[in-house]
Design a protein with these regions (language model features):
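Alpha-helical transmembrane segments and their membrane-interface boundaries
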Residues: 1-64, 111-116, 126-139
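Hydrophobic transmembrane alpha-helices of secondary-active transporters
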Residues: 18-23, 74-81, 103
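Membrane-helix interface "capping/anchor" motifs
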Residues: 29-34, 81-92
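Small-residue-rich segments of transmembrane alpha-helices in multi-pass membrane proteins
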Residues: 41-51, 72-75, 94-108
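Alpha-helical transmembrane-segment detector that highlights a single hydrophobic TM helix
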Residues: 59-85
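Alpha-helical transmembrane segments and their membrane-interface exit regions
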Residues: 72-78, 120-130
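Hydrophobic alpha-helical membrane segments of integral membrane proteins
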Residues: 89-94, 112-117
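Amphipathic alpha-helical interface segments
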Residues: 98-100, 118-121
Length: 139
């Protein structure tokens, strides 16, 4: 028989896959860096580290959470490119950073919060993209 924790962990991993897909889909359809696969991996990795941080016992959950943020920040730094006076990849870095936080939310069992935040993130990216498009047209 399957241990109850494994069912819970599997549900969390599946939800983090869905969260990564939701966030990565917008990036993918607009041909931006860090699309569906990358966001899924970031969400799942953060979820697994979060699950492990509280399931091991005797471990400071805050320290592992801080290390997730540090690791993701290192990954995000690799997406930022400076070309002469232009800086590219800041939004990609921000999206990966937020996706990691959503994966952590799922890992810690905050499903509703994670999905509401993912929806609001998508809405924000959509609205800002439309505003930027209108602004460019006026120029």
């Amino acid at each position: 028989m399957i241990e109850t924790n494994y069912i819970e962990y599997s549900i969390k991993i599946l939800c983090s896959i869905l969260i990564g897909f939701i966030v990565g889909f917008e990036r993918q359809i607009h041909s931006h860096d860090a699309g569906i696969k990358t966001n899924i991996l970031v969400a799942v990795g953060s979820c697994i580290f979060s699950i492990m941080s509280y399931s091991i016992g005797g471990v400071d959950v805050g320290r592992i959470s801080a290390q997730i943020v540090t690791g993701i920040s290192f990954l995000c730094a690799g997406t930022i490119v400076k070309e002469k006076t232009n800086i590219r990849g800041l939004t990609t870095a921000g999206v990966l950073w937020v996706t990691a936080s959503l994966g952590m939310c799922i890992g810690f069992g905050k499903f509703g919060f994670a999905f509401i935040a993912a929806g609001l993130i998508q809405l924000t990216l959509f609205i800002i993209q439309r505003i930027e498009h209108l602004w460019r047209k006026k120029k």
